Amino acid sequence: MEVKKLLEVLTTAEHLKDVPRHCYTSGGRRESVAEHSWRLTLMAYWVSDEFPEADLEKLLKMCLIHDLGEAFTGDVPTFEKTEKDEEKEAHLLTEWLAKFPSPFREEMQALYSEMEERQTLEARIYKALDNLEALIQHNESDIDTWISLEYDLQMKYGNDKVAFSKYLTALRDEVRNESRRKIACKGEKSK
């Protein structure tokens, strides 16, 4: 990529460092979209031994780019996101991608399409891990930062995304168990 163009796209991507997500970190501050994407990518790398048939490079790229559209729209929590929100993010991302040079433009467009369709192993792994990372982060945050509907989300969110994999289902089950322990502990403290 030409140097000036690289700096331009990096500047846009840098915005994700300042885009807050709904969830809090264990240190008590709002998590950024960049932090979520970073840990999602680590998760993909660290579970790759469970999926030797998956294209790890493609999976890592999916994880790295999956929320770039939020540099333009901010993060809208999944339980608030509407079809209109999704369309706006997709439109702005498509406009931005159109300005990329080849081969990055075509590769990223193909990756986004594959991620949306979720037919390939890599796309299914990415989406499952994306959901799981959010659940894990909620378990790591102070439960007093949870809103009421998150108690139910911690039990159900992502179940459909992990169903294709015994390993990811086991990970989801353990995350759910951690959520139950956290909720039970809060109940004990409030007595």
Question: Where are the regions a protein language model picked out?
Answer:
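Active-site helical microenvironments for divalent-metal-assisted chemistry
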Residues: 1-191
